[in-house]
UniProtKB/Swiss-Prot annotation:
The keyword Methyltransferase does not apply. SUPFAM superfamilies: HLH, helix-loop-helix DNA-binding domain. This is Transcription factor bHLH48. Homodimer. Keywords: DNA-binding, Nucleus, Transcription, Transcription regulation. It comes from Arabidopsis thaliana (Mouse-ear cress).
Length: 327
């Protein structure tokens, strides 16, 4: 293989600057071929030029991995015998020379056609895919950690909300207990247990007890139901008692007018002992009006009183006459 033809073709494509670089590189390359021992020059450089760019760079920078790369290349069209002695070579450490060799190794890829295109497309794509996978895995792990943190924080937040709600309920219950103390009363259905309703209930119970006492005093009042009817019956009974007392007082006064019965004080004391103090004022006022009611008595009452008065006067006149006769 003539190296100058490949370099001329490459220089024709690249330009005058690339042509000069190719001429200089060809001179240096010939110098290397002439200086190297004859046992190692059998087709190894031609194989290097026919290799892809990435493999040539790896072989030039990492000579220890030449055996593994030679095995991968043997799977293609190149024979394994051409690359085996190339693994023991030592290349110069000039970076410019290595870059030029890697650049001009594209000639072999253009000559090989599909094989070089497949290798060139497959090799750079794999590292990118691996990098994408490596980048994606930490993102997934980060997302999982974030989800776990969010779930943990949400659980803590719910626990805090529950604690706050329980504390607020306790505070409300304590405030209510301070405001309204608990009343140990077993209330029936429809009955309240607050202080006002309890006071009203006690007042009604007292009134009912007094009404029962009045019903016991008034005859025939036990059979009557209803507060209004009971009160009417009590009023009628009291009025009848007043009339009876008036009649008795008038008869006593007609029989012996000298006897001064202090009926007002007697009746007031008796009524006070029998009835509640709330009726004392009314009864005393009514008793004060009883003497005046005698003037408004019916005619039959006045006639009876007149006969009684005449009888008393006749007895009084007879008594002194009898005394005179005895004398």
């Amino acid at each position: 293989m003539d190296l100058t033809q490949g370099f001329r073709a490459r220089s024709g494509v690249v330009g005058p600057v690339a042509g000069l670089e190719s001429l200089n590189f060809s001179d240096e390359f010939r110098h290397l071929v002439t200086t190297m021992p004859p046992e190692t020059t059998g087709g190894s450089f031609t194989a290097l030029l026919e290799m892809p760019v990435t493999q040539a760079m790896e072989l030039l920078h990492f000579p220890d991995s030449s055996s593994s790369q030679a095995r991968t290349v043997t799977s293609g069209d190149i024979s394994p015998t051409t690359l085996h002695p190339f693994g023991a070579l030592t290349f110069p450490s000039n970076s410019l020379l290595l870059d030029r060799a890697a650049r001009f190794s594209v000639i072999a890829t253009e000559q090989n056609g599909n094989f070089s295109g497949e290798t060139a497309n497959s090799l750079p794509s794999n590292p990118g895919a691996n990098l994408d996978r490596v980048k994606a895995e930490p993102a997934e792990t980060d997302s999982m950690v974030e989800n776990q943190n969010q779930s943990y924080s949400s659980g803590k937040r719910k626990e805090r909300e529950k604690k706050v709600k329980s504390s607020t309920k306790k505070n409300k219950s304590s405030v209510e207990s301070d405001k309204l103390p608990y009343v140990h009363v077993r209330a029936r259905r429809g009955q309240a247990t607050d202080n006002h309703s309890l006071a009203e209930r006690a007042r009604r119970e007292k009134i009912n007890a007094r009404m029962k006492l009045l019903q016991e005093l008034v005859p025939g009042c036990d059979k009557i139901q209803g507060t209004a009817l009971v009160l009417d019956e009590i009023i009628n009974h009291v009025q009848t008692l007043q009339r009876q007392v008036e009649m008795l007082s008038m008869r006593l006064a007609a029989v012996n007018p000298r006897i001064d019965f202090n009926l007002d004080s007697i009746l007031a004391s008796e009524n006070g002992s029998l009835m509640d103090g709330s009726f004392n004022a009314e009864s005393y006022h009514q008793l004060q009006q009883w003497p005046f009611d005698g003037y408004h008595q019916p005619e039959w009452g006045r006639e009876e009183d007149h006969h009684q008065a005449n009888f008393s006067m006749g007895s009084a006149t007879l008594h002194p006459n009898q005394v005179k006769m005895e004398l």
